[in-house]
Amino acid sequence: MPTSASASAVMSAYRATRNAQRKPVLARYEVLGYLSSGTYGRVYKAKELVANGSTTDARVFAIKKFKSDKNDDAQVLRGISQSIIREIALNRELHHENIVSLHEVLQEKTSIFLVFEYVDHDFLQIIHHHVFVLRKPIDGVVVKSLIWQLMHGIEYLHANWIMHRDLKPANILISNRGVVKIGDMGLARVYSNPLVPLYSNDMVVVTIWYRAPELLLGARHYTTGTVSYTHLTLPTICSV
């Protein structure tokens, strides 16, 4: 029977071989810029590198880099957190025109990277553009289209027993073609019927201004109401 020391040596050799065979992220993608950050990591805009290292006519992606644990200035990988596993698992199962799609998952040393399709804008940017630049409300026909597409994506999530739990303008992405994509499934959870109030068996999550009755109280309401209000009135909820 192998000893724990020999088993550890075998695993170390396996990890070394596996890591040597992996291409570094920067050998596969050229980072074009920083997009956003959150509790668990940062998101970057990147362009795919083709075989010769060129980015001509290459596809553009959004790469989410998860933060690793730090211990006295040394980064340590203490296994993959439950939230990361949940986000990866959910995104791999979701395939819908109004949900941001996951392209691939990469690991490099102590970091995990999720490579998503890139979407040009988020609704918070659209709000700011209309409030501070155009100084006029969003056209009613456009609002109807955005809300319809948003509801279409939500219907798909709920049909698969998934609750987003952090729906807000910054997580509603819009392409240059006007296609709405629901993004950031980091706080999403599979739920059951009947709906259980969030405080009964889970820590309270969701951006504070968008905490909805169905999450806090198990009520028959939905965050879409607050998001639709923002569509129609332009100010974000926190400024009301």
Language model features with spans:
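Protein kinase glycine-rich loop
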Residues: 32-38, 43
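Glycine-rich ATP phosphate-binding loop
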Residues: 44-70
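Conserved N-lobe beta3->alphaC-helix segment of eukaryotic protein kinase catalytic domains
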Residues: 65-94
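Activation-segment/catalytic-loop signature of the eukaryotic protein kinase fold
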Residues: 105
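Conserved short submotifs of the Hanks-type protein kinase catalytic core
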Residues: 111-122
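Activation segment signature within eukaryotic-like protein kinase domains
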Residues: 146-147
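Conserved small/polar residues in nucleotide/adenosyl-binding loops
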Residues: 229-236
